[in-house]
A protein has these predicted regions:
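Active-site mouth of glycoside hydrolases
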Residues: 53-339, 344-386, 392-483
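Histidine-centered catalytic/metal-binding microenvironments
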Residues: 487
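Bacterial Sec-dependent N-terminal signal peptides
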Residues: 1, 7-52
Length: 487
């Protein structure tokens, strides 16, 4: 109903009084709603998980524990979890809740989530929206999304590994911090045409991957850029969840803090390697000083992410504030099943009447996988660090991307990886890459505000994602998760 003009004519004094009263009333309502949110969170958590999930994950003698019970897990990557939990652009809380329910029902109790997303907007190969748009300037809707995600995880007795930074370009990462401190530099051209000068971080899909890697290798040499990254760590580790009222350092839904996604020094020289170890040491000690309750790890790919230097891998994972080691395995990206697939702008689908290398070469992928795991385990043996395979992925048959399309090769590979975790004792847990769930994929290459899947914006959507429609893969995951929990 519209009020008459006369009914809206009040004196300035009366208006001010009413505004003051309204502000007080709204403040009381806000506090009441926050208390109600907290109450219903605690009530639902107590109802669903009475007596469970009260401990932090710890490490003892190279194993994870929850209280006195060994903790082994099958998890997934859900880098977009905080964005999906937002009520702003890109957010969809209804979908997030449903995805978490699906994950729980499959037996997945661990998710690896990005708490970065940095720098300039408008780059097609970057995720959107960004969490940190300028140094210390944060998108509060995504922070709220992270709080919501952590609350929902705790309700389900699930745990998160949260990573702050990224060596790769798809979330900003190294390059964003260099841009913020005004770094400019020259790199060698990948086409042999000489040297190129860049005022901002090169975009790999436009300027070249070799150009990008040379440029961002300067991150670990740049004290100003690293200082900004440390400020981001302080911001996130000291955060209080707006829905539960709990400090993150006290959260049982948090398993570990992770320094970066696939941190690298990107150059195979002694200076870069030494500075890389120094940075991992500084960041891990900083995190531990702010939060002594939770585990800390690197986010490393393993030897492959350490310039193929196994001793560098060992050095960063035996630092005092690093609790466990991680490795990633990518048979497709690393050429273990052939080199046909390396140009993201090419049509890589395989004709129906042609042999499918994704299926035919899966044994080669399995052989290389166990060799990679064995090497990591051998170099860390006796150091008391569990190893987590926190990323692994495999394409769909014939390099298709659609949900529900054949996954014979992937299913064989997943089965093999899970069998290693179950039987060898060399891997304490894993997170497959990654969860696409119930996303409605509209484009092969991500367009702004398309549904998120686990394939970042620079990759084909569906390349490595596991969808809810992938029933044979989900059954393998479910059986493997259940088997680990029974051990």
């Amino acid at each position: 109903m519209r009020k008459s003009f006369a009914s809206l004519r009040y004196t300035a004094t009366h208006t001010a009084s009413m505004q003051t009263t309204l502000l007080k009333t709204n403040a009381m309502k806000s506090r009441t709603l926050r208390l109600a949110d907290t109450f219903f969170f605690l009530l639902s958590a107590a109802t669903l998980w009475a007596g469970e999930g009260k401990e932090f994950v710890t490490v003892k003698d190279g194993r994870f524990y929850l209280g006195e019970k060994e903790y082994r897990y099958v998890g997934t990557n859900l880098w977009y979890g905080a964005i999906l939990g937002s009520e702003g652009s890109g957010g969809n809380r209804q979908r997030l809740v449903r995805e978490l329910d699906d994950l729980y029902n499959v037996g997945i109790d661990n998710v690896r989530v990005l708490i970065g997303g940095d720098g300039r907007d408008g780059i097609p190969s970057h995720i959107a929206p960004k969490l940190q748009t300028a140094p210390g300037v944060y998108n509060d809707t995504i922070l709220a999304g992270l709080d919501f995600l952590m609350m929902e995880l705790e309700k389900r007795n699930m745990r998160a590994v949260l990573y702050f930074n990224n060596a790769w370009e798809w979330s900003g990462g190294y390059g964003a911090y260099l841009d913020w401190v005004g770094y400019k530099g020259e790199v060698e051209s990948s086409d042999g045409s000489g040297r190129k000068f860049f005022e901002l971080t090169p975009v790999p899909s436009i300027d070249g991957w070799w150009e990008y890697m040379q440029y961002v290798s300067n991150f670990i040499l740049n004290e100003q850029a690293k200082a900004l990254a440390a400020n981001h760590v302080r911001k996130m580790v000291t955060r209080r969840n707006r829905y539960t009222g709990e400090l993150y350092k006290d959260s049982k839904a948090l398993m570990a803090w992770e320094i970066a996604n696939e941190p690298r020094c990107f150059m195979n020289d002694s200076l870069h390697k030494a500075k890389f170890v120094e940075w991992i040491d500084e960041q891990s000690r900083l995190i531990k000083s702010l939060d002594p309750n939770h585990l800390v790890t690197t986010g490393s790919e393993g030897k492959h992410g350490c310039e193929d230097d196994i001793n560098l891998f060992k050095a960063i994972h035996t630092l005092p504030a690093i609790d466990y080691a991680c490795i990633h395995i990518w048979p497709n990206n690393w050429g273990w099943i052939g080199q046909f697939n390396q140009n993201y702008d090419a049509d890589k689908t395989i004709a129906e009447d042609a042999p499918d290398p994704i299926v035919e070469n899966v044994q080669a992928a399995c052989d290389s996988t166990i060799a990679y795991i064995n090497e990591a385990h051998k170099v860390l043996e006796g150091h008391g660090r569990p190893i987590v395979l926190e990323e692994f992925g495999y394409p769909r048959d014939r390099f298709l991307f659609d949900a529900g399309s054949p996954t014979k090769g992937r299913d064989i590979y997943y089965n093999y990886v899970f069998s290693i975790i179950s039987s060898s004792g060399k891997i304490a847990g894993c997170n497959f890459w990654g969860w696409g769930g119930r996303a409605n994929v509209k484009h092969t290459i991500w367009q702004r505000w398309d549904d998120y899947v686990c394939d970042p914006a620079q990759e084909e959507q569906g390349l490595n994602s596991v969808f809810y429609a992938d029933k044979s893969t989900l059954e393998i995951i479910k059986k493997s998760a259940q088997a680990l929990k029974k051990r």
